[in-house]
Amino acid sequence: MSVEEFRQVIDIDLNAPFIMSKAVIPGMIKKGHGKIINICSMMSELGRETVSAYAAAKGGLKMLTRNICSEFGEHNIQCNGIGPGYIATPQTAPLRELQADGSRHPFDRFIISKTPAARWGTPDDLMGPAVFLASDASDFVNGHILYVDGGILAYIGKQP
């Protein structure tokens, strides 16, 4: 990965949420409340080959989320994050396609075998947590990252 590619990932996955937060927080302070939901990632908890920039950006976003909570919580602003696990999207489709011999892609087998839910997540799996974090029911939830990962972090965390 080049330095420019690294910077681009940081710009999209860390700097953009920071800039968005700076833009909306003054209005939230004036209004007396607000909710920010950042899309973090389970990769903020893991070190994995080939995802250094992404993991660094999402780790930074996790800490930005917690710091916005600390800095602006007194203004009744909640800042939380959703940490998706492996989600079935068009971007991950090549990893879920059957091989020419009819077998599953090795990464697909890995995800299914290591995720206690035994499946990839779907975008729909993220809707309920987002609705909860945006609702009044989460008014006392602040600075939290809600991992929606089918349990893979718990499973990987217990491995030797």
Language-model features: locations:
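C-terminal helical subdomain
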Residues: G81, R104-A137, V141, G150
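Residue(s) in the substrate-gating loop at a strand-loop-helix junction
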Residues: S41
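Active-site helix of classical SDR
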Residues: S21, A57, T65
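Alpha-helical segment proximal to the catalytic Tyr-Lys
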Residues: P26, S70-E74, D139
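Active-site loop immediately N-terminal to the catalytic Tyr-X3-Lys motif
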Residues: L46-S52, E74-H75, A118, D136
